[in-house]
């Protein structure tokens, strides 16, 4: 697994692209602040927007708040410089206070970013190489924490050549459509991001570009 870095297998080089995700962490909330927002069960939350946010409380009483931006850089570039994007954090902070207006004035103690690999089917794909001696999984699209254990078991099944319930799943057998090479990748991804944002502001109504991508099974997500 190479995560966001280029695949060592030529067949997979166009299967994923790296996108940058950004997150903020608040200072610890007081009991009064927790009461004000009514988040009693402290479960993790993700909204249903195309350019979605995710947020959850921490054990020491903070709120982790991230998402929205999923930024792609021309040529599938990965560079630590892309992790320092003040405008992304300012936008996230604005969205945070829109979500929790009761917490206006709360400060953020941490901010960070990182790249994830995304595939056109929004979930990992699997395969073998070197005559079946190597198994791989890639394209977790930000879902790796929950699915890597499953992926590890799938890869063990593939190495064993075993026909199991896992290896018979459509999501394991199917390969995603590849992303196009440059400059089509950058143009297509940025146009798609703009269309996704427009859909979020039009009660989810998708334009012709998104409907076409849906029809052919080609997508972009963070």
Residue ranges of predicted features:
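Active-site substrate-recognition segment that forms the wall
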Residues: 1-32, 36-132, 212-222
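Short strand-loop junctions, especially beta-strand C-caps/beta-turns
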Residues: 68, 139-140
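Short beta->alpha junction loops/turns
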Residues: 115, 140-141
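C-terminal lid/capping helical subdomain adjacent to the catalytic/cofactor pocket in oxidative enzymes
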Residues: 130-135, 141-222
């Amino acid at each position: 697994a190479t995560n966001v870095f280029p695949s060592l297998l030529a067949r997979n080089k166009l299967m994923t692209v790296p996108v940058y995700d950004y997150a903020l962490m608040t200072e610890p909330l007081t009991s009064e602040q927790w009461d004000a927002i009514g988040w009693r069960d402290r479960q993790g939350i993700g909204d249903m927007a195309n350019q979605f946010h995710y947020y959850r409380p921490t054990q020491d009483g903070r709120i982790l708040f991230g998402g929205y931006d999923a930024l792609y850089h021309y040529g599938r570039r990965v560079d630590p410089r892309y992790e320092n994007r003040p405008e992304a954090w300012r936008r996230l902070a604005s969205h945070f206070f829109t979500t929790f207006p009761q917490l206006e004035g709360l400060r953020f103690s941490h901010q960070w970013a990182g790249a994830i690999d995304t595939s056109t089917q929004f979930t990992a794909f699997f395969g073998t190489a070197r005559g079946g001696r190597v198994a791989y999984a890639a394209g977790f699209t930000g879902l790796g924490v929950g699915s890597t254990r499953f992926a590890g078991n799938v890869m063990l099944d593939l190495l064993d050549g075993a026909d199991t319930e896992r290896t018979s799943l459509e999501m394991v057998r199917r390969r995603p459509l590849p992303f196009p090479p440059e400059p089509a990748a950058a143009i297509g991804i940025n146009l798609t991001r703009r269309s996704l944002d427009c859909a979020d502001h039009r009660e989810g109504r998708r334009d012709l570009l998104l409907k076409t991508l849906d029809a052919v099974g080609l997508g972009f997500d963070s």
